[in-house]
Amino acid sequence: MRTTFMAKATDVERKWLLIDAEGKTLGRLSSEVASLLRGKHKPTFTPHVDCGDHVILINVEKIVLTGNKLDKKVYYRHSGHPGGLKQTVARDLLANKPERMLELAIKGMLPKGSLGRQMFNKLHVYAGDTHKQEAQQPEVYELRG
């Protein structure tokens, strides 16, 4: 009888992946990056262990939203004080903080809890085409779709 393989946190080998987000759709890119951060592309995937790779996203300001989402999609945040609800349209968020838009989309696709926060820390998002992780020698990753 065979037993199910369960990876240990010490045995996980992590790679650094570089993804160019130019011209990619927000949701399709986010779901694939979330899968890479979880480690679901590896045959040794274990749900209760952080098996994912580090992901570097560049050219995030050139991301695409389909339909009328640039004008209709609204992002909310709250200061914690009464009447402190702020809202921002996707067009303004993309112009001012394009990294935040992708971070919010990916964070919502990761598990909620300490393991999800640990996975989210392996995400590195940059608006331009330069990044600070040249020393890690990331390999270019081509998306499936």
From Swiss-Prot:
Pfam families: Ribosomal_L13. GO terms for cellular component: cytosolic large ribosomal subunit. It comes from the Bacteria. Coiled coil: none annotated. PROSITE patterns: RIBOSOMAL_L13. The keyword Ribonucleoprotein applies. Keywords: Ribonucleoprotein, Ribosomal protein. One of its GO terms (biological process) is translation. One of its GO terms (molecular function) is structural constituent of ribosome. The keyword Repeat does not apply. This protein is one of the early assembly proteins of the 50S ribosomal subunit, although it is not seen to bind rRNA by itself. It is important during the early stages of 50S assembly. NCBIfam families: rplM_bact. Belongs to the universal ribosomal protein uL13 family. Part of the 50S ribosomal subunit. This is Large ribosomal subunit protein uL13. It comes from Exiguobacterium sibiricum (strain DSM 17290 / CCUG 55495 / CIP 109462 / JCM 13490 / 255-15). The gene is rplM.
